[in-house]
């Protein structure tokens, strides 16, 4: 199995990417990794090149650049070359912690869209209080969705949850303003009717306040709604931890309590860190394309590689294609 990784993408590149890749190579004997980026910088962090190949390029896409234009103009950028490795059959999948917009553009223009899928979806795995997590799609790839798009997202998310996350008959919920049938805008109502007849375990509407309670294994929404929900959850978690830290550091007594509670607080922090679940998959493309978090450390990169490997090994893309074909969506 071969995975191409943009070694220059992310806040801590290339060090975090290289260390994460080496950790994955030690863990999986069937894995070969191509690191795309500045060879000199990569080799400074690389302690062993066993089953690791370096594809040198000096070019990268900056987060400040317009995504589509950058992908079209910078053919030798590390992210674009990683995607090109997939298109040329040199890699089974690719990963980048770089610009989300640029990776979506590279996925569409280089890797290519799966036949029958109108709009790809960006899908991270989010944390829940029980530690199991849930898949949410879309969170920003397609902000102006049609009912057929969300129908396809539900099917793709269900296949992923079953194949990669090992959830038998995963529960699929539609993010809405209420749990009752008939709630929501016209898009939600149309999608609800379609999902009732879909070949999935549709559990109906779910509200954002219940997401962290694990109300569903797959949560479907348009990209605008999903992005707002994602960032609201992120912001709330950061604010709560910040307020908790402030209170625990406010006096000598509370500092003593903090020292006692520290191991438990670290467990809680890790449980709510969605980067540990891997990256956000771009569903609807011809091959797995994974967006790692921009601030990924080596462990987060390793998690993204593990996730990508599972997608390839469990044949998620061919399975999605087969299900779509049966549903006459191709």
UniProtKB/Swiss-Prot annotation:
Show the InterPro entries listed in the entry.
Answer: FA_synthesis, Phospholipid_synth_PlsX-like
Pathway field of the UniProt record reads: Lipid metabolism; phospholipid metabolism
EC number, as in UniProt: 2.3.1.274
Q: Which domain of life is it from?
A: Bacteria
Q: Which reaction does it catalyse?
A: a fatty acyl-[ACP] + phosphate = an acyl phosphate + holo-[ACP]
Query: Transferase: is it a keyword of this entry?
Result: yes
Annotated SUPFAM superfamilies: Isocitrate/Isopropylmalate dehydrogenase-like
- Keywords from the UniProt entry: Cytoplasm, Lipid biosynthesis, Lipid metabolism, Phospholipid biosynthesis, Phospholipid metabolism, Transferase
- According to the UniProt entry, the coiled-coil residues are none
Which terms under GO biological process does the entry name?
fatty acid biosynthetic process; phospholipid biosynthetic process
Molecular function per GO: phosphate:acyl-[acyl carrier protein] acyltransferase activity
Which Pfam family, an example, fits this chain? FA_synthesis
Location in the cell: Cytoplasm
Q: Which Gene Ontology cellular component annotation is one that this UniProt entry carries?
A: cytoplasm
The subunit field of the Swiss-Prot or TrEMBL record says: Homodimer. Probably interacts with PlsY.
The text of the family note is: Belongs to the PlsX family.
Q: What does this protein do?
A: Catalyzes the reversible formation of acyl-phosphate (acyl-PO(4)) from acyl-[acyl-carrier-protein] (acyl-ACP). This enzyme utilizes acyl-ACP as fatty acyl donor, but not acyl-CoA.
The record ties this protein, via HAMAP family, to: PlsX (MF_00019)
- By its UniProt entry, which PANTHER family does this protein fall under? FATTY ACID/PHOSPHOLIPID SYNTHESIS PROTEIN PLSX (PTHR30100), PHOSPHATE ACYLTRANSFERASE (PTHR30100:SF1)
- The name of this protein is Phosphate acyltransferase
Question: What gene makes this protein?
Answer: plsX
């Amino acid at each position: 199995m071969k995975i191409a990784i943009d070694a220059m993408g992310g806040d801590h590149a290339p060090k975090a990417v290289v260390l994460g890749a080496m950790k994955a190579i030690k863990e999986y004997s069937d894995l070969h990794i191509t690191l795309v980026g500045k060879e000199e910088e990569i080799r400074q962090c690389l302690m062993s090149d066993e089953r690791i190949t370096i594809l040198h390029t000096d070019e990268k896409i900056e987060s400040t650049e317009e995504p589509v234009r950058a992908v079209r103009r910078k053919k030798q950028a590390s992210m674009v070359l990683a995607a090109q490795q997939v298109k040329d059959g040199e890699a089974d999948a690719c990963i980048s912690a770089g610009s989300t917009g640029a990776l979506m553009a590279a996925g569409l223009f280089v890797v290519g869209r799966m036949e029958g899928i109108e709009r790809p979806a960006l899908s991270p795995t989010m944390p829940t209080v029980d530690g199991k997590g849930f898949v949410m799609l879309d969170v920003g790839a397609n902000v102006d969705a049609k009912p057929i798009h969300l129908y396809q997202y539900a099917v793709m998310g269900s296949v992923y949850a079953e194949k990669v996350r090992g959830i038998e008959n995963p529960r699929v919920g539609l993010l809405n303003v209420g749990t009752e049938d008939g709630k929501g805008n016209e898009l939600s109502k149309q999608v609800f009717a379609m999902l009732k007849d879909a070949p999935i375990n549709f559990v109906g509407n779910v509200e954002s306040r219940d997401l962290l309670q694990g109300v569903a294994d797959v949560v479907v929404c348009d990209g605008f709604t999903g992005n707002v929900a994602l960032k609201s959850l992120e912001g709330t978690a950061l604010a709560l931890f910040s307020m908790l830290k402030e209170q625990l550091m406010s006096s000598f007594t509370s500092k003593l309590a903090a020292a006692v509670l520290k191991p438990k607080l670290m467990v809680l922090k890790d449980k709510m860190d969605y980067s540990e679940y891997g990256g956000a998959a771009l569903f609807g493309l011809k091959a797995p394309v994974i967006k790692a978090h921009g601030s990924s450390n080596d462990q987060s990169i390793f998690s993204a590689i593990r996730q990508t490997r599972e997608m390839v090994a469990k044949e998620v893309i061919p399975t999605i294609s087969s299900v779509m074909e049966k549903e006459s969506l191709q």
